[in-house]
Amino acid sequence: MDNYTYSELLKSLQNKCDNIALIIKPEKIKQELERIEKEQEDPNFWQDVLKARDTNKEKVRLNRLLETYQKTKNSLDESVELFELAQNDNDEVTLSLLYEEAPTLEHSVQKVEIEIMLSGENDASNAIITIQPGAGGTESQDWASILYRMYLRWAERRGFKSEILDYQDGEEAGIKGVAFIIKGENAYGYLKNENGVHRLVRISPFDANAKRHTSFASVQISPELDDDIDIEIDEKDVRYDYYRASGAGGQHVNKTESAVRITHFPTGIVVQCQNDRSQHKNKASALKMLKSKLYELELEKQQSSAKNEEKSEIGWGHQIRSYVLAPYQQVKDARSNIAYSNVEAILDGDIDAILEGVLIAKA
């Protein structure tokens, strides 16, 4: 990096910071935080528990956004000042240090941009994830299990928790399907763009001739809705099936019909849950999954209508990302059009750069 390149980078980051300030309005955030603090001082504040909880969540979000912005702006202002001094004094040591820290500075500005993008209605929610293998038997079932592990490892890296709702083992390897929740702040916001078909190209470990195979798996993401969000489901529109649990989470197989499957006739959505020994709890979890999927479906319809698009173009059936392991190694996202070479790390859950790249591309 040279002086000109660094100078242009600073100008770009300053423009971004100025735009961020126009969007978030730091002074208004401070005023809103003061208003919330006064409201919390009222002895009657906690009488409405749901409202108090939502207010507190908003306070935490605003505080974090303001602190992240101010910290980034201070770092940027300091870098601009140091750069001017170092140039005037021909201080090569300071200039070299500034060049080294440039990626960190750029990343911190990007983090503030991401914070703004994760301020949607359900972005702070937990994420319900369903993974289904495509056609292709063992190959696709194994690919589905690799994706499942990738998301679990991503959750672990972030300190998030996960909970299995339904798990079906594959016949020879992998899984026939899995549904699980990732619990953590902004889990849905980060993962919401993972909806779609994920494609894998590799030398098959199940082919004695070591031929290259292409496999597909679909990923569906929906927000775990708060209990106070009301989604009406007419009982005549659903069918409940009860069966014996099997696979991971179904250790009590062949003892009780605790697993629950719900079919929603108007949409064709099918959800199932077998993670608990209690049929009642599994039914409640399955209903929560169904409500989340119906909510997500309604959002898609609204977005499709607003953009004048066919649902097929924005639904779950389109290919969003390719993972190529042979003859070369590359992961490429169709939305951001960015290619990544650290395939092994990505499949081990290092997907933040991909998720953030898509968020920025869709902003």
From Swiss-Prot:
Main localization (coarse): cytoplasm
UniProt entry tagged with the keyword Cytoplasm: yes
PROSITE patterns for the chain: RF_PROK_I
Assigned GO CC terms: cytoplasm
GO molecular function: translation release factor activity, codon specific
Pfam family, one: RF-1
Top-rank taxon: Bacteria
Subcellular location: Cytoplasm
Residue numbers carrying N5-methylglutamine: 251
Keywords carried by this UniProt record: Cytoplasm, Methylation, Protein biosynthesis
InterPro entries registered for this protein in UniProt: PCRF, Pep_chain_release_fac_I, Pep_chain_release_fac_I_sf, PrfB
Post-translational modification: Methylated by PrmC. Methylation increases the termination efficiency of RF2.
Family: Belongs to the prokaryotic/mitochondrial release factor family.
Role summary: Peptide chain release factor 2 directs the termination of translation in response to the peptide chain termination codons UGA and UAA.
Protein name per Swiss-Prot or TrEMBL: Peptide chain release factor 2
Organism: Helicobacter pylori (strain HPAG1)
